[in-house]
Regions:
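Divalent metal-dependent hydrolysis catalytic cores, especially in the metallo-beta-lactamase
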Residues: 26-43, 102-104
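Secondary-structure boundary/capping motif
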Residues: 34, 94-97
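Glycine-rich, histidine-containing beta strand-loop boundary motifs that form or position
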Residues: 41, 107, 161
Length: 232
């Protein structure tokens, strides 16, 4: 048996809203004393691939992705595959599990952040685990609701920093009791519920600022789609 300290939900600059290059994420994780991190960028595995390519002996990389499904976001760990966006979340969960990946529903009840739990309770039961602490949700109501659901249905509970900047890497730490210091062993331990969490909230000022910039980015994207085209 070996205890692994791990942040299971981290974004890099490969995400549209990520600010931190891969090498800096790794440096911060090592500074925080983590044994492993899972890089889960939005709908891309480029960040995870870059991290694996660095082959840093000081930290284990669990490749992953945060998939935008029809009902909301889904973490898929143990893969460099890019899963199709917009599909039904249950279909994506089953596809990922069939390929040996680990599925986690992140921030399942956060109303403004693509919360699968608000649209598909079946997905929470189908997934391998539920993220019951997300450091970027300052008010604890949604996290508490996720934990209550997980306990009721005996689902493994995970934490994640959901860091989009380097300074918050490690704000959601998991202590995983794995058989070996390998990615498959870590994922298997999570499936079996051999995991405990230690958490720290993102400061309210930072959370508010990040949320504001995300709203601005979405409005700009929507506005650009509505621009009239020239008729020639």
């Amino acid at each position: 048996m070996v205890l692994i300290t791990c942040d299971l939900h981290i974004h890099t600059s490969a995400s549209a809203d990520g600010k931190c290059p891969v090498k800096d994420v790794i440096a911060k994780a090592k500074e925080r004393g983590l044994d492993a991190i899972s890089i889960t960028d939005h709908d891309t595995t480029e960040g995870a691939k870059q991290a694996l390519a660095l082959k840093d002996p000081g930290i284990m990389i669990i490749p992953g992705i945060e998939v935008s499904t029809k009902q909301g976001h889904l973490l898929v760990l143990g893969t460099t595959k890019v899963f199709e966006q917009g599909k039904d979340v249950l279909e994506t969960i089953r596809e990922a599990k069939a390929e040996g990946c680990l599925t986690i529903v992140p921030h399942p009840y956060h109303r403004w952040r693509h919360a699968v739990g608000l649209h598909s309770p079946d997905a929470l039961r189908e997934a391998d685990a539920i993220e019951v602490f997300n450091s970027r949700y300052y008010i604890g109501t949604a996290n508490n609701r996720a934990a209550k659901f997980a306990r009721k249905y005996h689902k493994p509970m995970t934490a994640g920093s959901d860091a989009h900047t380097c300074q918050f890497v490690g704000y959601g730490i998991n202590i995983i009791d794995a058989e070996e210091r390998t990615v498959p062993s870590i994922l298997d331990a999570i499936r079996k519920g051999k995991i405990e969490s230690r958490c720290k909230k993102t400061p309210i000022r930072t959370y508010t600022s990040q949320s504001f910039h995300n709203v601005v980015r979405k409005v700009r994207r929507q506005t650009s789609r509505l621009k009239p085209r020239r008729v020639r």
